[in-house]
């Protein structure tokens, strides 16, 4: 509620060029507030003859004539102070908003927290479900109407020259597209982009809207931003994270695993050219995040797009090292076997010589000893060649190689290997 300010008892006199006194100013402000909320444009036009359109209204919470002042939301405040246009935008009163703009209301006027009219509209965007195509009951119909009014207000603001790239003065210094990614919908992103919003704008944390959409795994928003030219390989300057790394991190989390979320978002980025082996400032790539999370479908998808399973972080950690950090990963022996088969040289320790925490657990004592022996055992030239062929061509060109190579050789490259075979 950025445009609501709390005032003490000393500052209750109305300010502005007219300097209306006492009950006259209070009554006028209440009437103006009610006219905006009722969308009574005739009354609004008449009241604006006595009240400058860009002058704040001050409403006492004790006022019995203003439904807004009696709202439970504001009971802790003595007065409410806001611009008429901010009130119309926040409560999605399209007719009042248009009337105010036609009478010279400034959409770029900011409240005490540095929010413009557009910022406030986005901060108060209505929450509706995207799972229904048509409303099936009265509640859904009402929510659909609320959403429609919000879109209409947004179009009105844009048509009257609202600055779609204006940053919030405080906090994370979001642009409207960042706010729309957090609070809005993909349609809001599209409307803002149509009106000149910069899709690769960075906020105070150096994140673009695509970074934020990827971080919350919102595929519709990601599709919209990419369609409007968002860079899929732009990195957050403070961390080096790309949209792919953020999406993989969220999808590989416990919540991502439980909800089976994010695979479509990751594939979307990869299909549109995301660099699968891009690394952050710590040298971590998406495959490191995926292996630590241990979610098989994500690891397989990254491998399909030629993720390098031998890439090291700045601390010398390989993807297999990350995978072996967690006991739950190690119990998936089939996935462990596939990763081991692709890893050469097999690097178990980091630059400090430390082993992954998972294989230090007592229950994995025998496995730890076997893996250490395997890491010290040089492979034959034939096995090295097989691993290189598989790592270079991956799953994407698997069927092409099947047509080109003799069946016996192809089977030796792409055949399934169980853990017992690898660790004998």
From Swiss-Prot:
One Pfam family cited in the UniProt record for this chain: Ank
ANK repeat coordinates: 80-109, 113-169, 172-201, 205-234, 239-278, 282-311, 315-348
A Gene Ontology term for the protein's cellular component: nucleoplasm
Annotated keywords: ANK repeat, Repeat
PANTHER family hit by this protein: ANKYRIN REPEAT DOMAIN-CONTAINING PROTEIN 23 (PTHR24193:SF122), ANKYRIN REPEAT PROTEIN (PTHR24193)
Protein name: Ankyrin repeat domain-containing protein 61
Organism of this sequence: Bos taurus
Primary gene name: ANKRD61
């Amino acid at each position: 509620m950025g445009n609501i300010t709390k005032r003490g008892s000393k500052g209750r006199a109305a300010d502005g060029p007219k300097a209306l006194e006492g009950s006259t100013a209070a009554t006028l402000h209440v009437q103006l507030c009610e006219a905006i909320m009722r969308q009574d444009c005739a009354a609004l036009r008449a009241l604006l003859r006595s009240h400058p359109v860009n002058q704040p209204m001050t409403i006492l919470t004790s006022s019995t004539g203003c439904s807004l002042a009696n709202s439970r939301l504001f009971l802790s405040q003595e007065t409410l102070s806001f611009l008429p246009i901010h009130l119309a935008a926040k409560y999605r009163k399209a007719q009042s908003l248009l009337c105010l703009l036609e009478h010279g209301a400034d959409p770029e006027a900011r409240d005490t927290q540095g929010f413009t009219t557009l910022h406030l509209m986005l901060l108060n965007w209505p929450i509706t479900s995207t799972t229904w195509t048509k409303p099936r009951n009265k509640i859904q119909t009402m929510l659909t109407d609320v959403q429609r009014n919000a879109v209409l207000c947004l179009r009105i603001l844009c048509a009257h020259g609202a600055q779609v790239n204006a940053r919030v003065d405080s906090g994370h210094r979001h642009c409207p597209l960042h706010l729309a990614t957090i609070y809005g919908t993909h349609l809001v992103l599209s409307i803002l982009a149509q009106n000149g919003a910069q899709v690769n704008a960075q906020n105070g944390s150096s994140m673009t809207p695509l970074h934020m959409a990827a971080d919350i795994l919102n595929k519709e928003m990601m599709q919209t931003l990419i369609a409007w030219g968002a860079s899929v390989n732009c990195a957050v300057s403070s961390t080096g994270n790309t949209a792919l790394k953020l999406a993989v991190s969220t999808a590989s989390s416990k919540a991502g695993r439980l909800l089976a979320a994010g695979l479509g978002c990751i594939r979307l980025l990869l299909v549109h050219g995301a660099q699968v082996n891009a690394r952050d400032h710590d040298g971590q790539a998406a495959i490191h995040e995926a292996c630590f999370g241990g979610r098989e479908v994500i690891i397989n998808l990254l491998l399909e797009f030629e993720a390098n399973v031998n890439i090291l972080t700045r601390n010398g950690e390989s993807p297999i090292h990350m995978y072996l950090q967690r006991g739950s990963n190690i119990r998936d022996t089939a996935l462990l076997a596939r990763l081991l088969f692709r890893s050469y040289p097999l690097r178990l320790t980091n630059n400090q010589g430390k082993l992954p925490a998972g294989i230090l657990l007592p229950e994995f004592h025998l496995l730890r000893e076997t893996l250490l022996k395997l890491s010290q055992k040089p492979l034959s030239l034939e096995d090295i060649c097989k691993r290189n062929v598989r790592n270079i061509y991956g799953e994407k060109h698997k069927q092409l190689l099947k047509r080109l190579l003799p069946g016996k050789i192809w089977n030796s490259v792409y055949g399934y290997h169980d853990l017992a075979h690898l660790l004998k």
